Amino acid sequence: MNNSVYILEDRAIIYVNGEDAKDFLQNLISNDINKVTNNSSCFTSLLTPQGKFLFEFIVAKHKSGFFIDCEKTQSDQIFKQLNLYKIRSKVEILNLSNEFVVASFGYEKYLSIENSKDILGFTFKYREDPIILDPRNKNLGARLIINLEKLYLSLKKLDLKDDK
């Protein structure tokens, strides 16, 4: 089994939080935000009001809000687009790319971790950070969205080796 982990430096994390976060995202994304729970994440798109494709990303539940795992090159545009739609919604939108990273590891390693399940998009917490089986295809492996300060200790405890 390959225990390698890769820090996906081309990914960024945006956090949407607040009283209206769920309804706010439900009105903007192409997938049903109600599918996103502590145990399930989804792959979705952000569309224009006319239904034209803008961006795609993974949404995962985190605490009282939602992580958006997106391409780093598009994160500023996604952040601006979300803020454009914010209007009077009671939401806070934060770009956490300097604080959180996305670490990726293989499907076999994912299955060896306690509490994992062989279900696309299945999500469980390692401490308080989500581990997600890629919702698009299990062969893409799993992702751990984690605070940079906890990264190396968590990799050690999960028996993952950083292959930069």
Predicted regions and their residues:
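Basic, glycine/lysine-rich polyanion-binding surfaces/domains
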Residues: 1-164
